[in-house]
Amino acid sequence: MPLSARNHLPGVIEEIQRDTIIAHVVIRVGEHLVESVITRRSADELALEVGDHVTAVVKATEVMVAKP
């Protein structure tokens, strides 16, 4: 499926926590972890499970950078 977002990060789901409305998905991308918050419905429709190979798609308008 073609997307306009240019930042595609292939990885493996390390953790998923489904709440009533949202799901927190932790994806290992190389040495790093990327966390995504998606709707519970989307997580269920994609049948996401720990160990699944997925791609994190990042849009530049949705990324913030903070310096400790």
Description of each model-found segment:
Residues 1-68:
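Non-catalytic connector elements of ABC transporters
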